[in-house]
Amino acid sequence: MIRQRTLKNTIRATGVGLHSGEKVYLTLRPAPVNTGIVFVRTDLDPVVQIAANAEYVTDTTLCTALSRDGVKVATVEHLMSAFAGLGIDNVFVELSAAEVPIMDGSAGPFVFLIQSAGIAEQGAPKKFIRIKREIVVEEDGKEARFLPHNGFKVAFAIDFDHPVFAHQKQTASVDFSTTSFVKEVSRARTFGFMRDLEHLRAQNLALGGSLDNAIVVDDYRIVNEGGLRYEDEFVKHKVLDAIGDLYQLGHSLIGEFRGVKSGHGLNNKLCRALMAQQDAWEIVTFEDDTQTAPISYAAPALA
């Protein structure tokens, strides 16, 4: 049986919010079966819980933000991507502010935290969403689609007219039956253009952004001294973002996602379009050991 997963232990970290620039305390706690991923604003009295669900996504300006009853949690996508990549179903994410800390701009530090806490398998079958037919959303020359696929695959294309991108691979296709999320995707950092920074900061955005948590590109080159972590790090980060955005469906996917210049907003529209067409998907579990599951996760390492 493929079982639901949570953490073995509680684990804490501190970082800064990418957009707020504020210090944020993050605590990840184990949660019972069928809880899902739940964000908890512990700085509020009473505390407010917001489930990581596509219907609560209210703002997609440069990040994915959830809100409920006027309370917001922003920049959830990299942490959500780490949960998806490691197959974590149930966890409470406690935050001391309205934004998940940016860490190094990738999902890598969150993967490390989760692995350090340890992964515990639980006494209930893991639920998957299986895509049964194609769903497409399009907007301003961008598109996002789901297709049936016996596994989980993400393909993405970006198209930046910029000297740096002239030498970069702008497409990636990752089949997770043969590729490790941790090794090949999780360390890809968010990226931004120096020319946009002033404009963003005037809107109180990217106040915590720096060379420590993003790839920064000026008019001609990558500013970061260390260069790139992967030769296709830009498009790989878009894959990472998409995995986090799709995990707002509440379950791991059996299917293929294809994005062309898609961002958080279009990814969310695709999730909502899928949920609205109930003949396009089904919930499946793998309780019988004789069934060959199309998706497998690494055995939980001992913490």
Swiss-Prot record:
Q: Does the keyword Oxidoreductase apply?
A: no
Q: Which UniProt keywords apply?
A: Hydrolase, Lipid A biosynthesis, Lipid biosynthesis, Lipid metabolism, Metal-binding, Zinc
Which Cys pairs does UniProt list as disulfide-bonded? none
Q: Does the keyword Plastid apply?
A: no
Q: What is this protein called?
A: UDP-3-O-acyl-N-acetylglucosamine deacetylase
One annotated Gene Ontology cellular component of this protein: membrane
The molecular function terms of the Gene Ontology recorded here are:
metal ion binding; UDP-3-O-acyl-N-acetylglucosamine deacetylase activity
Q: Which Gene3D superfamilies match?
A: lpxc deacetylase, domain 1 (3.30.230.20), lpxc deacetylase, domain 2 (3.30.1700.10)
